[in-house]
């Protein structure tokens, strides 16, 4: 992990195509802009964590009897 200290107006460049700029600092809040290609997904940490939790919950293994019942339903049609 890299920890950096930046002042308002200063930038951090990540790779060749991502630039993070410190816009302002007020109290304990920092306002950033992130310039990145559209294909780079950018999430706030709490949103990313919520998405990961939803994906993990959705990936619960299925009971094989459910799949068998689905196959039988398709055959009866």
Curated annotation (Swiss-Prot):
Coiled-coil boundaries: none
An MF annotation (GO) of this entry: mRNA 5'-UTR binding
One Pfam assignment: CsrA
Subcellular location: Cytoplasm
GO biological process terms on file: bacterial-type flagellum organization; mRNA catabolic process; negative regulation of translational initiation; regulation of bacterial-type flagellum assembly; regulation of carbohydrate metabolic process
Keyword presence, Protease: no
Disulfide pattern: none
One GO location term (cellular component): cytosol
Keywords: Bacterial flagellum biogenesis, Cytoplasm, Repressor, RNA-binding, Translation regulation
Superkingdom of origin: Bacteria
NCBIfam families: csrA, PRK01712.1
Assembly description: Homodimer; the beta-strands of each monomer intercalate to form a hydrophobic core, while the alpha-helices form wings that extend away from the core.
Function: A translational regulator that binds mRNA to regulate translation initiation and/or mRNA stability. Usually binds in the 5'-UTR at or near the Shine-Dalgarno sequence preventing ribosome-binding, thus repressing translation. Its main target seems to be the major flagellin gene, while its function is anatagonized by FliW.
Family designation: Belongs to the CsrA/RsmA family.
Identification of the protein by name: Translational regulator CsrA
Record organism: Desulfitobacterium hafniense (strain Y51)
